[in-house]
Amino acid sequence: MALRFPRFSQGLAQDPTTRRIWFGIATAHDFESHDDITEERLYQNIFASHFGQLAIIFLWTSGNLFHVAWQGNFESWVQDPLHVRPIAHAIWDPHFGQPAVEAFTRGGALGPVNIAYSGVYQWWYTIGLRTNEDLYTGALFLLLISAISLIAGWLHLQPKWKPSVSWFKNAESRLNHHLSGLFGVSSLAWTGHLVHVAIPASRGEYVRWNNFLDVLPHPQGLGPLFTGQWNLYAQNPDSGSHLFGTSQGAGTAILTLLGGFHPQTQSLWLTDMAHHHLAIAFLFLIAGHMYRTNFGIGHSMKDLLDAHIPPGGRLGRGHKGLYDTINNSLHFQLGLALASLGVITSLVAQHMYSLPAYAFIAQDFTTQAALYTHHQYIAGFIMTGAFAHGAIFFIRDYNPEQNEDNVLARMLEHKEAIISHLSWASLFLGFHTLGLYVHNDVMLAFGTPEKQILIEPIFAQWIQSAHGKTSYGFDILLSSTNGPAFNAGRSIWLPGWLNAINENSNSLFLTIGPGDFLVHHAIALGLHTTTLILVKGALDARGSKLMPDKKDFGYSFPCDGPGRGGTCDISAWDAFYLAVFWMLNTIGWVTFYWHWKHITLWQGNVSQFNESSTYLMGWLRDYLWLNSSQLINGYNPFGMNSLSVWAWMFLFGHLVWATGFMFLISWRGYWQELIETLAWAHERTPLANLIRWRDKPVALSIVQARLVGLAHFSVGYIFTYAAFLIASTSGKFG
């Protein structure tokens, strides 16, 4: 008999029903469960697949460069970044008819095009690219890197080049190489690029491979470095009247500490960023030499962790046993990596708009909105994934004997206290926040807005004042002109920073009031509830009072039959599934808040947000309804406009989202009956019955149907908001 899919599981391959296909897809990446898997093959497969992942990433970024060079308007955008709309790529087949062709022909293009809202134009411009030839060169280089990654992946699957398990478990060497190599050397290389290429380009000097060795990045060359006069590199920075990309008002400094933003581009000073990356490189190059490898010097991770025993013995055996637990569990390592990456991605979202690094991106409002929303959603998915793999660790990899009385065991032992405290916090936040919103709503409805309960966020305002914001009248730390910190920084970074923080046109430390206080607590409710579900799912993954033997049932099980009535919906997978809905809703509130606050800031009517955000009807009417009106008019009886594609996506997003409920609110029996009826009809219909299949059609399992429902809910939800966000912002600001 020919080998059937899935080859990695003979048990599944012999399944006579369509379950074979769906379970095969579902477990394709669960290498641990495959036939004939060994620890060595598991590590080698994952390692090789990383190269494939890198190849895809480089191919994708190469494609971005290539399409902009081929079909974009980069060179004309560079001449006037504030008024030319950047083109992502052409549209081959604009729907529908001549009005569509006219609506989508913009940005100086000859035919219909898509506008870029990704910020790549600003990024490439900032790092020194200026011509289409530069873009083509970059695309070709990344294509080469992609091919090398693929070859490396293939190579590391060959017997001679397969690394051993001991190589994968050499934590110190990996840490040293990742700290020094990945972060240290790459930051140093980036500093080099900024100093040798990007900063000269910002001053009108075109440095490429042909003149790279002839152009001094600084008039003094390397002299100050070797004589210890490093301050010379900071002297004569670009002036406030500097025109980016020209020598007008340009200085000669390469490593500065100016603070604040370049007045014309509204982005951080390039010389400040070069300085920052040099400092990061220095720190990480040192950090990458701290762990003991072949040379017998430096820290041993195991010794470090074993020494971490809290004094007085009140917290048990501290970190004893953690080294082997983490080093032998891929799920634990993945959980840690995802948790870190998720937090970093969310921080990227927060910093990209408040401290823009790329020239002119702050004035491209749609791009700012798109990048913030994109990074927050990505962060949400990554963070929920961290808890999912944490739960799988507890089920598959956790060894109670190895972790006796250490921090991990103690987390499990007092999980009731953790879960109940989180539950209390969520209930408190939810009822109080909703109570305030509903009260204010009723007061507005009855025409007595003065009876609203409006709470000033005085603690947050105090923190903003401590960082130098003067408008609240707190005379504290950096907002106090006679403090030591203020005086110490007056000649260095502070003037730029204080100008930026008190300038009302940027997004640095926005002025906050009662509307912000309320939505902040609504978001806190969402964060705490999402965390509650995820933490409970992981801590109860091995077992609970209700189901002490839960770990024997694995990560995702629907129920343990009718005999134990209460065991449905309590697998660790179910917790993840529920948490994703909460995560999506929470990030919905986060992005609504960010977007509305910024729309009013950009339009110069901040009072609309301040007055309408304190009650629910204000959010529904003055944010959602008001901003979707243009979107809903993408198609109308008079034809179409450039927003029509977003109008279509808005409708389509709702359709996908609603389809999710079809899977979420009906279970196996219904579908099984339906499938059997359809199969019966198919077999008795002429022509149709010429098509036969080997597998008996059966309904999806409960867990799989939930996954399909969740996928549709998530994709539809994000599609809908993406269309709303881009259309409402670009419709207002072009």
Curated annotation (Swiss-Prot):
Coiled coil region boundaries? none
Which reactions fall under this protein's catalytic activity? reduced [plastocyanin] + hnu + oxidized [2Fe-2S]-[ferredoxin] = oxidized [plastocyanin] + reduced [2Fe-2S]-[ferredoxin]
This protein's UniProt keywords? 4Fe-4S, Chlorophyll, Chloroplast, Chromophore, Electron transport, Iron, Iron-sulfur, Magnesium, Membrane, Metal-binding, Oxidoreductase, Photosynthesis, Photosystem I, Plastid, Thylakoid, Transmembrane, Transmembrane helix, Transport
Residues engaged in binding phylloquinone: 671
Task: Please give, as recorded in its UniProt entry, the membrane topology of this protein.
Answer: Multi-pass membrane protein
GO cellular-component term (any): chloroplast thylakoid membrane
Q: Give EC number(s), comma-separated.
A: 1.97.1.12
GO molecular function per UniProt: 4 iron, 4 sulfur cluster binding; chlorophyll binding; electron transfer activity; magnesium ion binding; oxidoreductase activity
Q: Which residues bind [4Fe-4S] cluster?
A: 559, 568
Whether Coiled coil counts among this entry's keywords is: no
Q: Where does chlorophyll a B1 bind?
A: 654
Question: Which Pfam families does this entry report, sorted A to Z?
Answer: PsaA_PsaB (PF00223)
Q: How is the cofactor bound?
A: P700 is a chlorophyll a/chlorophyll a' dimer, A0 is one or more chlorophyll a, A1 is one or both phylloquinones and FX is a shared 4Fe-4S iron-sulfur center.
InterPro entries (UniProt xref): PSI_PsaA/B, PSI_PsaA/B_CS, PSI_PsaA/B_sf, PSI_PsaB
Biological-process GO terms, alphabetical: photosynthesis
Places the protein is found: Plastid, Chloroplast thylakoid membrane
Which amino acids does the record list as binding chlorophyll a B3?
662, 670
Q: Which domain of life is it from?
A: Eukaryota
Record's keyword annotation contains Endoplasmic reticulum: no
Q: What does this protein do?
A: PsaA and PsaB bind P700, the primary electron donor of photosystem I (PSI), as well as the electron acceptors A0, A1 and FX. PSI is a plastocyanin-ferredoxin oxidoreductase, converting photonic excitation into a charge separation, which transfers an electron from the donor P700 chlorophyll pair to the spectroscopically characterized acceptors A0, A1, FX, FA and FB in turn. Oxidized P700 is reduced on the lumenal side of the thylakoid membrane by plastocyanin.
Q: Which family does it belong to?
A: Belongs to the PsaA/PsaB family.
Classification via HAMAP family: PSI_PsaB
Tell me what this protein is called.
Photosystem I P700 chlorophyll a apoprotein A2
Q: What is the lineage of its organism?
A: Eukaryota, Viridiplantae, Streptophyta, Embryophyta, Tracheophyta
Gene that encodes the chain? psaB
